[in-house]
Amino acid sequence: MLTYAYIDGANLHQWSKSRWGIDYKKFKRRLSEKYKCTRIFLFLWYIKGKESLYSQLSDQWYTLVFKETLEIEGKVKWNCDAELVVKAVSSVYEDKTTKAIIVTWDGDFACLIDFFKEKRHPITLLAPNKSYCSYLLKKRNIPIVLLEEVKHKFQ
């Protein structure tokens, strides 16, 4: 069984930065060992000047998928939801994965969970905690692992 992880980089970064930080190398190891992930996609923004961070993540065997950013009134805007959904769905149709791990709390991904369930592909959601997990995801009746409860494994 091939297991791919799809990480909503904005959600993970935003939440971990505001709470407790994350060691991406340890997080990758956790995904590989606990969930047997053979490929880990990290969807994130591309900001000029952050190339060393991207190289570091790539060296840790993350497959980086970038979204171009837009600066509006001095704030950087971006969203990789569509890219994550397209990559996950295409992986199923190309017979590259049979199980998915999705790291997010965003209810916009409820349709992706429905897709995996319809295709009878096991799916596990990793969300920050109960209050940072959309009701739309919670009601999908899939395994949800709360990162706050296992954060000691990747801090």
How does the language model describe each region?
Residues 1-80, 118, 122-124, 130:
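Domain-level signal for Mg2+-assisted phosphodiester chemistry and nucleotide/NA-binding surfaces
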Residues 26-27, 83-87, 108:
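Well-ordered alpha-helical segments embedded in enzymatic catalytic cores
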Residues 30, 87-91, 115:
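A generic secondary-structure signal
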Residues 41-45, 99-105:
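Acidic beta-strand-to-loop metal/phosphate-binding motif
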Residues 52, 87, 111-112, 135:
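Phosphate- and divalent-cation-binding pockets in alpha/beta enzyme and binding domains
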Residues 63, 100, 143-145:
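Short, well-ordered beta-strand core segments
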Residues 72-103:
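Internal catalytic-core helix/loop-beta-alpha segment
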Residues 113-155:
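Acidic, PIN/NYN-like endoribonuclease modules and their adjacent C-terminal/linker elements
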